[in-house]
Amino acid sequence: MQLAIVLVAAGASTRMGFDKVWADLDGEPLLARAVASARSLQPAELILVVSAERLADAARLAPEATIVSGGPRRRDSVAAGLAASRAAWLAIHDGARALAPPELFQRGLDAAQPTGAAVPGIPLKDTIKRVAASRVVGTPVRAEHVAVQTPQVFRRDLLLRALAMTDDDVTDEAILVERLGIEVAVFVGDERAFKITTPLDFALAGAVLSDSRHVR
């Protein structure tokens, strides 16, 4: 079964104030840890989507990978990664979710088989409110919702159709696949797959790595 893992790492990192996926985390770039996790799922193809100025850095980091330049929007970067592969299945993964365990990729591929699409989800810890004009207008039932992570796994033809259907930019590819009327399966995510988008997240990632060394 052909699988390509597309690591999306071309974002502007505006919340961090610096290019987070290339920042040092315990002695190596954050992106290197995402690459190491993806490498463990063999014989999957690895595609790195990075900003134009980081193409050479990415080639040194993962010489076995296909390196492509991303676009100004997330959907543009995903489309660039998709165009670089002919694999039947694509796992779209945020480079900033660098501590996602390798087993998430296989879990996602297995979960996607019935419908062609699957996303990892974890239970919400906080109460969620719908807000308009700084006023609460509703409270969804927390048990009916999950926080969605990556890797998100799709059959190639579905993802191609979803991207071709609209030029809208979205926060994840599952939104576009849902608009096709396709049922998206949800599999069990992992708290370690959190997205590192703030300095506090970066500090937490360092603590997770330190704790994992002590456990071993």
PLM region spans:
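N-terminal glycine-rich phosphate-binding loop and ensuing alpha1 helix
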Residues: 1-53
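Conserved N-terminal catalytic core of the sugar/cofactor nucleotidyltransferase
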Residues: 31-88, 166
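Conserved core of the sugar-phosphate nucleotidyltransferase
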Residues: 58, 99-187, 216
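Short beta-strand-to-loop acidic/aromatic patch adjacent to the donor-nucleotide binding site
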Residues: 87-97
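Short active-site oxyanion
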Residues: 42-47, 116-117, 192-193
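Structural beta-sheet core signal
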Residues: 5-7, 48, 92, 117-120
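Residue-level signal for inorganic ion chemistry
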Residues: 7, 31, 81, 93-94, ...
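SAM-dependent methyltransferases
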Residues: 1-4, 172-174, 191, 199-216
